[in-house]
Amino acid sequence: METHILFFILAGLLIAVLIGYSIWSARREKSRIFSNTFSTRPPSSPISNEITADIPTTLNPQGVVAQQPFNTETPADFIQSQQEVENSVKNIRISLQTQEISQPLYQETMPESPSEAYQQNQIQEQTVQVEQVETIEQTTEHNIITLYVVAPEGVQFQGNAIVQNLEMLGFHFGEYQIFHRHLDNPASPVLFSVANMMQPGVFDLARMEQFSTVGLVFFMHLPSVGNDLANLKLMIRTVESFAQSVGGFVLDEQHQIFNDESRQNYLLRVAN
């Protein structure tokens, strides 16, 4: 009889221990889940999709008095160089004949009150100003014809050779520290000009012995003095002669080899 009582007591204690352990385990698991809901670990850095690359040293302006370091350009570098040249050409201002911009006509309406009339006048003035700015920007962008002469890969044009060949072709060093081809003498109007492809785009005649560059840009503003078509033909012949003298290549505005098809496209632009 005592054995059965002892057995029931032990069984009851064992059951109580199991129940207590189960309750304790459940609370511990619940506490662990809630404690991990918010992680204190710092967020990982996002992966950037941007590709960064150092700008080649040959494309950075080093100043006209210092010799530019030699560096072999890749196609991407060359395109970036052309963009810098185009920006430089746009910044070179040559006196041209300007045409008066016609303003659009507006229908007169009877305003209901003086305040409405004032507001309409302000809107019309702002519209005219915006249209004038857009027209001037478009005219400036499309009225510059450019050709490039670039050196072969791994080669640079030397300063003395550049000056000698440009002077033989009738260029004169002048305004903006670049070379110009004039209608007659240096006092006559400019037909077209040539600048350095590398920033800042100018030449220093006092340091031409130390000067070198990967290319030059020839450009002509339209309308030009006299006959635009004749001036463009002269510019094309001059550029091709210069390229042949210095051993370079002629490229068009799309940075492609200037061929017969490119020549016809250039002439059609002026003829139209």
From Swiss-Prot:
Cytoplasmic compartment segments: 26-272
Protein's gene: zipA
Membership in a protein family: Belongs to the ZipA family.
Subcellular location: Cell inner membrane
Summary of the function given for this chain in its UniProt record: Essential cell division protein that stabilizes the FtsZ protofilaments by cross-linking them and that serves as a cytoplasmic membrane anchor for the Z ring. Also required for the recruitment to the septal ring of downstream cell division proteins.
InterPro entries given in the database record: Cell_div_ZipA, ZipA_FtsZ-bd_C, ZipA_FtsZ-bd_C_sf
Keywords of this entry: Cell cycle, Cell division, Cell inner membrane, Cell membrane, Membrane, Transmembrane, Transmembrane helix
Record's protein name: Cell division protein ZipA
GO biological processes: division septum assembly; FtsZ-dependent cytokinesis
Membrane topology: Single-pass type I membrane protein
Side Periplasmic, residues: 1-4
HAMAP family, per the entry: ZipA
Principal cellular location given in the protein's record: membrane
Assembly and binders: Interacts with FtsZ via their C-terminal domains.
Gene3D superfamilies: ZipA, C-terminal FtsZ-binding domain
Cellular component, GO annotation: cell division site; plasma membrane
Transmembrane domains' residue ranges: 5-25
